[in-house]
Amino acid sequence: MINKNDIVADVVTDYPKAADIFRSVGIDFCCGGQVSIEAASLEKKNVDLNELLQRLNDVEQTNTPGSLNPKFLNVSSLIQYIQAAYHEPLREEFKNLTPYVTKLSKVHGPNHPYLVELKETYDTFKNGMLEHMQKEDDVDFPKLIKYEQGEVVDDINTVIDDLVSDHIATGQLLVKMSDLTSSYEPPIEACGTWRLVYQRLKALEVLTHEHVHLENHVLFKKVS
């Protein structure tokens, strides 16, 4: 039974589908997830705590037995999962989405300056994530695997602290893009490209939140 004192991030770790419920009411389960459900709900307007708990417990009861929960993977298997489920899809989506973001800014930016700022923020987000993921793959993840195998990694805490700091900066850029787009709600006059960009940026936000949560609250806890 999920209760009001349970930590938001822990609930998502145990029941990954709970992320959808927290997201629907604007509760951060990612970098800001180390608070109780009650505390998180009090920060949001129009969130009924009892209703939220009911929805969360419905998810708990319908959790599919035998379905993969990454928290049960060891460090090396979890890293492989993260790379396959998040790193590669994110790289592919950045490659495919960037031309549309550029086109939207170029065509509609002169009359809607916030679209120019959106592109600049997206570029910062994209470049930062690509660099971050490459460093994880090449440098940081191998250190975590060595640590799991019993080798001495003197800077393991620094590695984790630096990655968490990167994640916080990433979260701030996601908030900025959401604010610039009114939570990815296109205006009535929006063309097809405009709507496509907003839709895919929103999906990118969801994917990134899940990605960061898995690293911050599952992977890093296994080595700290």
From Swiss-Prot:
Swiss-Prot/TrEMBL keywords: Cytoplasm, Iron, Metal-binding, Stress response
Subcellular location: Cytoplasm
InterPro entries per record: Hemerythrin-like, RIC_family, ScdA, ScdA-like_N_sf
GO cellular component, one term: cytoplasm
Organism domain of life: Bacteria
GO MF term list: metal ion binding
SUPFAM superfamilies, sorted: SP0561-like
Main location per the UniProt record: cytoplasm
Any GO BP annotation: response to nitrosative stress
Pfam name, any one: ScdA_N
NCBIfam families, per database record: FeS_repair_RIC, PRK13276.1
Subunit structure: Homodimer.
Assigned protein family: Belongs to the RIC family. ScdA subfamily.
HAMAP family: RIC_ScdA (MF_01156)
Cited function: Di-iron-containing protein involved in the repair of iron-sulfur clusters damaged by oxidative and nitrosative stress conditions.
PANTHER family: IRON-SULFUR CLUSTER REPAIR PROTEIN YTFE
Protein name, UniProt field: Iron-sulfur cluster repair protein ScdA
The gene coding this protein: scdA
